[in-house]
Amino acid sequence: MSTVFLGMDFAREKFTHRVRGWRRVSSYNQRQILREGEYVDLVKYEIPAKFPASKGKKIIWFSDLHFKGHNELEEKILEESLDFSRDINPEYIVYGGDVVTYASVLPMVRDFLKSLPEKSKKMAVLGNWEYSKRWLKHRDWRAFFESSGFKLLVNESCEFDDFLFYGTDDLRKGEILGPKEVPDDKEIIFLAHSPDAFIHISNNEILEKTSLVLSGHTHGGQIRLPFLGALLTSSRYWRKFDYGHFVNNKAATNMIVSSGLGCSSIPLRVSCRRELALITLV
């Protein structure tokens, strides 16, 4: 039975005590826009590096394409996103799940993913839509991402240089598990489609050793009203993690929640721009 009603997740299992330790550093209205396209913004964040060798490394983070079919808007979104990514040419590119609505669009998205900068190490996680769309099985999604140049992480990790990326399964539809061990000598980057997923698995060790959490799913609310902000977030914690940069008071862990690139079943955005996020470790 679905726990989502009017864009809010009313799941019984919540970790309110873990949520209290997080504070918002920057909101939607405080975002730093590096470049503004016709449809997509490139927003920037600077995150403290735990190790000197990590300083200066760049990550492009994007999520929630939700593409429905070949049309001029979607082609323009991909074109602007590709231009931004090529200009930055980052060390890492990460995708946060919820790819398409219809299987017929997969070739277009694959071509886009394959066109991203070749030198960048690329990873992805699954979203709830990858489970809802039953025309592709789990192994097919892995093959799709591999053919696109991305490594799919489902409760698993991969290491590049001084970084360890850990990707979770989807909290709502999958079987989410945390890592068995968390090393001390790596820059730990957690990839979770929904911010709720990291809250779900973040015990003290994970929290203290993680440098950065990257999430999407909320679409920044997709429809934001003056003085109210996001109305619908599909989060168990409603607007707590709707968008922006968050820091944990206890562990100094950073979390970035993106507004995404597409739309949910409601094909409308109001005062909530599509975005790619550029994260630089400093």
Report the location of each language-model feature.
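Acidic, His/Gly-rich catalytic cores of divalent-metal-dependent hydrolytic chemistry
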Residues: M1-L42, V247-V282
